[in-house]
Amino acid sequence: MWNGIIPGLVLVAMITAVAFSAHNVSGFALFSPMILAVVAGMVYSNVLGTPAHAKAGIAFSQKRLLRFAIVLLGFQLTLGQVVSIGAGGVGIVAATLGATFVFTITLGRLIGVDRKLAQLIAAGTSICGASAIVATNIVTDARDEDVTYAVASITLFGTVAMLGFPLLAPALGLDQHAFGLWAGASIHEVAQVIGAGFQNGTQSGEIATVAKLTRVTMLAPMVIALGLMARRKTSGGQQAARPPMPWFVAAFVAVVALNSLVTVPAEVKSAMALATTIMLTMGLAAMGLQADISQLRSRGLRPLALAFCAFLFIGCFSLVLVKFV
């Protein structure tokens, strides 16, 4: 088995190394290594072609490594973090997440966006960007091109939010607490939330980070819900063999609980965070290696329009809640 996957793992690791190196270059620091890995993988695949002998290792990275990375993500979360923003903050985050997800799925159906792609865009917008798209795709089983399209669109509008929202704070009359809650409840990627939050002050950055991590804790119930939806959508009315709660979701919940009950040394948490980022980056590099640009073009602009509308909705909906609730 290992001999068969080594060539693909080496290729994925090389692209991952390029992504991390590029992330440290001025001008690219705005983008996470995960996003850069998708782009690098696509460029490699569509310019040079993906070798046949690397397919097994690429598939291993895309499936098993990604699942394990989602589990390790639990070491970055505790229930205490959720409690720290208060019941009102948790309510705003939960309401924004649920409303955005339903809005995006509904609008996607109305404008003719493929159901699976709409679900990926909905998850990426409402929860935590690329990580949510990856986790969601394990139960939706969309095409690699759909995953790449969703990641690209979420990255685009998340970057717009990261750069633009801090500039709007004074005009909207938001203090540091309110802005942090708004940024954490609405901006797509964790790194983008941190970037936007700390532009407005330390308190704002800390609240934004906690609010965002609260959204991440809702990844597990969202994946379970999508798993149940996928079972109902199977042909002939028969249930799919895939369980409604994948093993990695149960493991993710268990790790969050463990991290909440047991004091994990800071050095261990730091190592786990790095390992999580590396494995997520490898998984997205693998997806980029299997993405066909011609297939992306065939999707047209409707999914991009859907992502834009979802971006506007989550920003406006959460702002109203922060200002008036």
UniProtKB/Swiss-Prot annotation:
Q: What is its main location?
A: membrane
Q: Name one Pfam family in it.
A: Cons_hypoth698
Q: Is Transmembrane helix a UniProt keyword of this protein?
A: yes
Q: Which UniProt keywords apply?
A: Cell membrane, Membrane, Transmembrane, Transmembrane helix
Q: Does the keyword Transmembrane helix apply?
A: yes
Q: Where in the cell is it found?
A: Cell membrane
Any transmembrane segments, and where?
5-22, 26-48, 65-87, 91-113, 120-142, 147-169, 213-230, 245-264, 271-293, 303-322
* Any one GO cellular component localisation term in the record: plasma membrane
Q: Which domain of life is it from?
A: Bacteria
Which spans of this chain does the record mark as coiled coil? Answer: none
| Membrane topology field | Multi-pass membrane protein
- Similarity comment text for this entry: Belongs to the UPF0324 family.
Protein name (database record): UPF0324 membrane protein mlr2225
Tell me the organism: Mesorhizobium japonicum (strain LMG 29417 / CECT 9101 / MAFF 303099) (Mesorhizobium loti (strain MAFF 303099))
